[in-house]
């Protein structure tokens, strides 16, 4: 089932297959307003932040054309420097629906005069999200619509509810077949700047409440950052290019 509604802040595109239910806030960087599995909410939403004009710090923001902070708050492109904030510019964009089916949706957004003040390129971002019985597939692409080379990175920043990071069981597999366990993770770093797992293919997390989350990186996304600003409230699993 699919639907388009409004919650007073943003248009919401909704997909529901009876097991998974997803709501996307099109006017708030296409973030997840909700992701429910068998009636249980998986995603953190901060109502005050969501209802504001500030950069989303909840849901699942898109990271483009970079993640994190640039040195001295400046983006260096050739001989030019541009003021840059955290996690790029996509958080200021409104998304529009391209196709909307029973269990999938494709959306896009484009450069604006405002984004060109800090990132002087024409671009198109497209996201395709589809539900299956027990999973969500998120395909995110960036297209250069400028006449010159457009340097960029791409990523996602999903905030998953987690009552106790220290009681979470992590396992995974790298591209070369090596395995990952809790012993490979630095939980102090996770709670500060984040812990980067390079060349990670799969990451599995068993939460204290018994929910198991499995993340399979799609082609082009070769790194995964694990971070938490509140280890008794949420964790972020960032797929990064």
Region roles according to the model:
Residues 212-241:
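Active-site pocket scaffolds in enzymes
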Residues 98-105, 130-135, 162-168, 208, ...:
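A short, structured loop/turn motif at beta-sheet edges
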Residues 13, 104-105, 136-138, 203:
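Hydrophobic residues embedded in beta-strands of well-ordered beta-sheets
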Residues 15, 26, 109-152, 156-158, ...:
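Acidic, contiguous internal or C-terminal segments within carbohydrate-active enzymes
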Residues 21, 74, 81, 104, ...:
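Structural motif
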Residues 1-7, 16, 78-133:
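Extended, loop-rich substrate-binding clefts of extracytoplasmic carbohydrate-active enzymes
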Residues 1-74, 81, 199-219:
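Beta-strand-rich N-terminal accessory domains
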Residues 148-153, 158-220:
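Active-site/ligand-binding surface loops and adjacent short beta/alpha elements
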């Amino acid at each position: 089932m699919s639907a388009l509604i409004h919650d007073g802040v943003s248009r919401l595109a909704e997909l529901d297959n009876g097991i998974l239910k997803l709501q996307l806030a099109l006017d708030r960087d296409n973030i997840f307003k909700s992701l429910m599995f068998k009636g249980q909410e998986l995603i953190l939403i901060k109502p005050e932040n969501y209802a504001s004009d500030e950069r989303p710090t909840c849901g699942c923001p898109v990271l483009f054309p970079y993640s994190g902070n640039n040195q001295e708050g400046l983006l260096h492109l050739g001989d030019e420097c541009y003021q840059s904030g955290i996690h790029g510019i996509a958080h200021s964009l409104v998304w529009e629906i391209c196709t909307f089916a029973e269990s999938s949706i494709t959306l896009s957004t484009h450069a604006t005069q405002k984004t060109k003040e800090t990132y002087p390129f024409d671009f198109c971002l497209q996201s395709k999200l589809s539900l299956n019985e027990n999973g969500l597939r998120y395909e995110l692409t960036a297209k250069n619509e400028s006449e010159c080379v457009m340097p960029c990175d791409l990523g996602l920043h999903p905030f998953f509810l987690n009552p106790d990071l220290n009681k979470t069981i992590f396992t995974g597999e790298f591209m070369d077949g090596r395995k990952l366990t809790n012993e490979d993770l630095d939980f102090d770093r996770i709670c500060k700047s984040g812990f980067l797992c390079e060349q990670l293919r799969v990451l599995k997390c068993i939460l204290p409440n018994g929910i198991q989350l499995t993340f399979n990186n799609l082609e082009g996304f070769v790194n995964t950052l694990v971070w938490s600003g509140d280890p008794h409230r949420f964790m972020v699993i960032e797929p990064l290019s």
